[in-house]
């Protein structure tokens, strides 16, 4: 990824 993305829980 080129920028921080919100982490989606599995």
From Swiss-Prot:
Residues found modified as Pyrrolidone carboxylic acid: 1
Other noteworthy facts: Exists in two forms, due to cis-trans isomerization at Trp-3-Pro-4.
Gene Ontology biological process terms in this record: regulation of blood pressure
Function per UniProt: This peptide potentiates the effect of bradykinin on the isolated guinea-pig ileum, does not potentiate the effects of bradykinin upon blood pressure and inhibits the angiotensin-converting enzyme (ACE) from rat plasma.
Tissue: Expressed by the venom gland.
Main location: secreted
Subcellular location: Secreted
GO cellular component labels: extracellular region
Family: Belongs to the bradykinin-potentiating peptide family.
Annotated keywords: Hypotensive agent, Metalloenzyme inhibitor, Metalloprotease inhibitor, Protease inhibitor, Pyrrolidone carboxylic acid, Secreted
Protein name per the record: Bradykinin-potentiating peptide F
GO molecular function, one term: peptidase inhibitor activity
Organism: Agkistrodon piscivorus piscivorus
């Amino acid at each position: 990824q080129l920028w921080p993305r919100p982490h989606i829980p599995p």
